[in-house]
Regions:
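A short beta-strand micro-motif
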Residues: 2-8
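Acidic, low-complexity, intrinsically disordered interaction modules
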Residues: 11-70
């Protein structure tokens, strides 16, 4: 599973890609935030830097190409 750690200013949040659906442009991600694990489906977007999904109230871009195989 591909994993990415994001620092939100207070703590690290871990994202693990569960699946990517190119047909519906969605990515399913297991999010570990402060000890709680949630599986969330995000819309995939694309810009000049690649495919990403938006996370949090500030809609931070989390790029799929930043994930590393765990």
């Amino acid at each position: 599973m591909a994993e990415y750690q994001h620092f939100d200013g207070e703590t690290f949040i871990t994202f693990d890609i569960v699946s990517v659906n190119e047909r519906t442009n969605e990515v399913q991600v297991a999010v570990t935030n402060r000890g709680k694990i949630s599986v969330i489906t995000y819309d995939l977007c694309t810009d000049e830097n690649g495919e990403y999904f938006e996370y949090g109230c500030m809609y931070e871009k989390i790029y799929l190409n930043e994930f590393m195989e765990a």
